[in-house]
Amino acid sequence: MGKIIGIDLGTTNSCVSVVENNAPKVVENAEGGRTTPSIIAYVEDGEVLVGAPAKRQSVTNPKNTIYAVKRLMGRKFTDPEVQKDIGLMPYSIIAADNGDAWVEARDRKMAPQQVSAEILRKMKKTAEDYLGEEVTEAVITVPAYFNDSQRQATKDAGRIAGLDVKRIINEPTAAALAFGLDKQDKVDRKIAVYDLGGGTFDVSIIEIANVDGEKQFEVLSTNGDTFLGGEDFDQRIIDWIIAEFKKEQGVDLSKDVLALQRLKDAAEKAKIELSSAQQTEINLPYVTADASGPKHLNLKLTRAKLESLVEELINRTAGPCLTAIKDAGVNVSEIDDVILVGGQTRMPAVQDKVKEIFGKEPRKDVNPDEAVAVGAAIQGSVLSGDRKDVLLLDVTPLSLGIETLGGVMTKMIPKNTTIPTKHSQVYSTAEDNQPAVTIKCFQGEREMAAANKLLGEFNLEGIAPAQRGMPQIEVTFDIDANGILHVTAKDKTTGKENKITIKANSGLTEEEIQRMVKDAEANAAEDKKALELVTARNTADALAHSTKKALEEHGASLEASEKEAIEAALKELDEAIKGSDKEAIEAKTEALGKASQKLGEKVMAAEQAKSGGAAPGAAPGGAQQAAPDADVVDADFKEVDDKK
């Protein structure tokens, strides 16, 4: 059985970890980073860039550079949060045929799952390059407060990326695993995980206990806000810059897509700098232009000003924390440790708020960017059977129920119930001789069903004619370990049954997922072809370069016909390199190798004469073995090949 890798699929950054020799390791990507920006760019020639390369070109290609797509996962286009994002994002957010929020780039309409799959493919490839073997299984993390649709969407993204998602695990729970397994003591402890990431906020109260030599992680409660995170902090800075620039220059930058992308980069940079400095300068020359000429932006932003801009956002995290403490049935004084997760928790004002809420200093010995991926990898090693000393008991974040007479939400499974779990309840008909019932499944805490999230609906037909209230319809809610809901309705009189895995009345159909899997596979094949072409070009370039050099130095000792044959072969190879036919490049490379064989012999003879004998390891062959700097060219070629 291969490794089950752990992936933190973040709003702003993603991270991948593997467990080796019982120790988790965060894997560096091809660019050398331990985290990868969750940014995907669709460029003119059809290439898809992921991570740092996508971020680098975002200023010049804002409409086709997708970021923070996690905020759209499993959401309807009409959701208020999505509508708010439409006005802020430089790329197009559109309504799919089923009402879901999708994105559009280069005239391609794509589900958020498809875009997220590009990030997951990059994480998969990063792990494969490190392990030297194919990876097909993963544990992927989600915010604890993700609902059923969002969890299903994350699982679908994994499938599109070619991964069998063995488990969806909550981010705070994963961070608790990373923290708890690090502790060698046998002391039971209650911890609070405060997770303020790029797009979401979660808080979980978790008890870590030692039971018969096994570490048991039991989630007591969880709460959060799936539309609150570092991206919102950045937006407050962007809004402030726009207002200040309009005051000074009379120009509104909010309609300038290129300028907005530069502002986003500058805002993020300023926010990060102000975590350690008291003041920073935002300097953007030539940010825009009007009839009077180019305009430059130069503003000073202090930490105090930043804190006043985002104070309301920080305060919004207090409510979910207090609710989680209450739901866990503990006092604040009983919480032993507070763990910070997510890059936004590096902000001093956030740390001060955490101290104020929990009455103690948060711990600084957990890496907020990597703990979630590490925990996911640990859970992967548990699922693969490599680790047997860990038991994880997670919960469902929101109540689940069905709509009953009068539009009431009748709860079947209350929030913070340990999963997996199953619950059955018997209902009846509302009218005489009613032949069918519609089961509508909701998730949320409101008393009226319509105010909660409709997850899906289905019919149970063929109910035997009877007076209202007589038929017995047993509805069973079954939540698996991923937090995904399966519902069954059964007429106890006739034995008729209907069941569904909740996929919402939106979400991707099986056909759509299969099509997207095929698209992703086609992209992988295209990537392989592109890499092979680059490799062929590099090999050809190296040979052409060294042959030209050898021809300059030793061409005079060749017969005219030999020299002409080499020059003709060089010319043909140069032409082939300009094209995109790999076979032609390889054929012309081979032809040049044969044509320059005599030249190679002359070069070798000259080298031997110079050194007074055969060079160690010298071998007969083409001129590429003769050129003094051939090794340099080869090393360059290898570097390209490594990075793929």
Curated annotation (Swiss-Prot):
Induction: By stress conditions e.g. heat shock. The keyword Calcium does not apply. One of its GO terms (molecular function) is ATP-dependent protein folding chaperone. CDD domains: ASKHA_NBD_HSP70_DnaK-like. Residues 635-644 have a biased composition (Basic and acidic residues). Disulfide bonds: none annotated. PROSITE patterns: HSP70_1 (PS00297), HSP70_2 (PS00329), HSP70_3 (PS01036). It comes from the Bacteria. Gene3D superfamilies: 1.20.1270.10, 3.30.420.40, Actin, Chain A, domain 4, Substrate Binding Domain Of DNAk, Chain A, domain 1. Pfam families: HSP70. Residues 603-644 are annotated as: Disordered. Residues 612-630 have a biased composition (Low complexity). The modification Phosphothreonine is found at T200. SUPFAM superfamilies: Actin-like ATPase domain, Heat shock protein 70kD (HSP70), C-terminal subdomain, Heat shock protein 70kD (HSP70), peptide-binding domain. PANTHER family: HEAT SHOCK PROTEIN 70KDA (PTHR19375). Acts as a chaperone. This is Chaperone protein DnaK. It comes from Polynucleobacter asymbioticus (strain DSM 18221 / CIP 109841 / QLW-P1DMWA-1) (Polynucleobacter necessarius subsp. asymbioticus).
